[in-house]
Design a protein with these regions (language model features):
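Nuclease catalytic cores
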Residues: 2, 6-69, 268-271
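Charged, glycine/proline-rich intrinsically disordered loops and linkers
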Residues: 27-45, 88-96, 113-116, 213-226
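Hydrophobic (often cysteine-bearing) scaffold residues that line and stabilize catalytic clefts
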Residues: 49, 53, 107, 111, ...
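A non-catalytic, helix-rich entry segment at domain boundaries
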Residues: 56-137
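Short, well-ordered amphipathic alpha-helices
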Residues: 116-119, 187-192
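Residue-level recognition of the N-termini of beta-strands and the immediately preceding loop/turn
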Residues: 131, 164, 199-202
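Non-catalytic protein-protein interaction segments used by genome-maintenance enzymes to assemble
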Residues: 134-186
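Metal-dependent nuclease catalytic regions and adjoining charged, substrate-binding loops involved
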Residues: 179, 191-310
């Protein structure tokens, strides 16, 4: 039985060809054998420092909730700081990192600050439970006879008022600029199919920006920044994503993947430099731009050189 994750949906939405190159397909040999992803030369591989930091902070959330550290709140900061340091040192051995965008020390600081900020968000929003809390919750329900829709939620918990939440933590520097709210709705779809109920609340929380350190640009200027952004959910969202899952599976099974170059998406794609469609688009865009006209100088004007005049 085939499995479909949110990352599959998101990639096929934005660019089917990137999905093919990133995931591979049994009908295609992209240079490494049938079914294998397209290989990239070492110099073309993007740095995974953002992925590294995100994985470290996800581990922090997982340990805090699954190991029930909230039962001893005084020890949380020291234990989670240790978890972050150890996870960082472990993962940097397996990730392709180029310390050019930021230094190793800066990345470590972002993670350690993220621990402290996360605890502040937990306190401010009372993200505690006396009945149910699970981090890295894996869901793999069937949506039809041939397909499972899958998701791994950062945090699912029932709050002290009885409301069921699904939350996703983000290490983004610009909240809600690149997040897709359908990611959380996808997890809600998976949860409904797995457990028979919809969550009451969905939201993103931001490791860099607790209430005490708001971002420069609040995605909702009409309200105070709190470190958590709620996302709406309706039955129509669930039906829409269920239908999209089935259609996306059909597209993948058909095995025809066309490029869909869009600059804002291509800028995050590791294959941008080798994608013919994107390079052709860039050439056409460059040709449309008017060439800069050379500046003409009036020989009779006065030019200033240093403190003297000619």
């Amino acid at each position: 039985m085939k499995r479909l994750y949110w990352s599959h949906i998101s990639m096929v939405r934005k660019c089917p060809l990137r999905y093919l190159w990133y995931k591979g397909h049994p009908d295609h040999d992209l240079g490494a054998g049938l079914g294998k992803p397209k290989p990239l030369a070492f110099e073309e591989r993007p740095s995974e420092h953002f992925k590294l930091m995100g994985s470290v902070l996800s581990k922090v959330v997982e340990v805090m909730y699954n190991d029930r550290l909230l039962e001893k709140p005084k020890d949380c900061l020291s234990k989670l700081t240790e978890v972050a340091q150890q996870e960082f040192e472990k993962l940097e051995q397996t990730h392709h990192i180029m310390w050019t965008y930021l230094t190793r020390e800066e990345a470590m600081k972002i993670c350690l600050d993220g621990v402290r900020n996360f605890l502040e968000i937990v306190k401010d929003h009372r993200m505690i439970s006396k009945s149910y809390a699970q981090s890295e919750l894996s869901m793999t329900p069937q949506i039809n006879k041939s397909l499972k829709v899958c998701g791994i939620a950062d945090l699912v918990y029932r709050d002290l008022d009885g409301k069921l939440w699904i939350l996703d933590g983000k290490n983004a520097s610009t909240p809600m600029k690149y997040e897709d709210e359908d990611q959380l709705r996808w997890y809600a779809l998976c949860f409904r199919l797995e457990y028979g109920v919809l969550p009451d609340k969905l939201g993103f929380f931001y490791f860099r920006y607790p209430k005490s350190n708001p971002p420069k640009k609040n995605p909702d200027p009409s309200s105070e920044w709190t470190g958590l952004v709620e996302v709406s959910l309706t039955e129509d969202d669930i039906r829409r994503l269920g239908n999209e899952a089935i259609e996306t599976h059909r597209i993948i099974e058909r095995g025809v993947f066309e490029a869909n170059p869009v600059p804002k998406n291509c800028s995050f794609c590791e294959f941008e430099n080798i994608c013919e469609a994107r390079q052709e688009q860039k050439r056409l865009n460059a040709a449309k731009r008017k060439p800069k006209e050379p500046k003409e100088y009036d020989n009779y004007k006065t030019f200033t050189l240093g403190s003297g005049k000619l």
